[in-house]
Amino acid sequence: MSLGLYLHIPYCFSKCRYCDFYSRPGERGVPDAYVDALLRELHRFAPDAPLRPDTLYFGGGTPSLLTPAQAERLIRAADPVPGAEITLEANPETVTEESLRGFRAAGVNRISFGVQSARDTQLRTLGRPHSAKQARAAFAAARRAGFENISGDIMLALPHYTQAEFDETLELIEKGGATHISAYLLKIEPDSAFGKHPPEGLPTGDEAADFYLYAVEQLEHHGYRQYEISNFAKPGYEGRHNLIYWDCGDYLGLGPAAHSCMGGKRFCYAPDTAAFLQDAAAPIMDGSCGAEDYLILQLRLRKGLDLDAYKTLYGKQFSTAQLAFVQNCVRAGYATFDGSTLALTPAGLIVQNSILAQLL
């Protein structure tokens, strides 16, 4: 079974207005002491030999605030298996061709740019520190630096959103050479700046659903195959790290607020960088990974839930009433079901929570 390693880099220039992830804004780099703390935790979980993960993911925060030398220290210590996917999330304004060449030489082989929109006015509304021009330059620099596996993020249903804005953003990312695109509906989180002061011009729920379906249609038309609710890829470029999450595989998350699931057990670190640096934030047990997690995560994927595997792994099977509900979903265009695999359509993915409420 594959093992994923997630390294949380909480530092960032500024907090985006929609973000409620744990982060440390106002920083221009990553202290070496923080890298040392991550190395300490790597040794905690793999004291006798390197961890050797199948995927390694630098998430944040803004992981591109790492220096290539810092990234290389962490990659070498983890010692991923040959052919491992090693991803670095990056903000366009934080990278240069030189830094990207450094990350590539350090072992990073997949770069993920947080673009969100091709319109500068929208980027300012979101609190993003980059411009569309910087995003274009970042993609071009990544290609020159030798990256072939490049992902870009798009946010949907933003304030005063239009299909034309999506088209412009897709064009920027596609022309940038992206092999993978993540497209997320804006969600107003209570603890974010938008949660405290919602922006004007937000689409209605029905309008947001229409934007999502339009995005799926256009991405598929441009050769990006949907394989998960929010993720689309050229053939062979699906994100292997996140697939470990969605297939309920083992993953180890290190850093403040990072979550793990190893051997069916969940644990996490407290969202406290100071405590993490001082080795005062040992991981906290947080329940187990069970049948509900498996069903929820598998139904995020376009391949769907294999009912035979569900029964084999967890001894679970749908009741007569649940099977009748599934057939209703099929008739409504929300799902496909061949007797052994239940998969949600794009329309079904929009109402996934309502469907899950009947299946859990």
Where are the predicted features?
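Local cysteine-cluster metal-coordination motifs and their immediate loop/turn environment
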Residues: 10-21
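A short, conserved structural fragment
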Residues: 331-340
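C-terminal scaffold of the Radical SAM
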Residues: 2, 23-47, 52-316, 337
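Minor-groove-contacting beta-hairpin "wing" of winged helix-turn-helix DNA-binding domains
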Residues: 341-345
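Immediate flanking context of iron-sulfur cluster ligation sites
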Residues: 1-9
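Short, amphipathic alpha-helical interaction segments positioned at domain boundaries
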Residues: 347-360
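Short amphipathic alpha-helical interaction segments
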Residues: 316-330
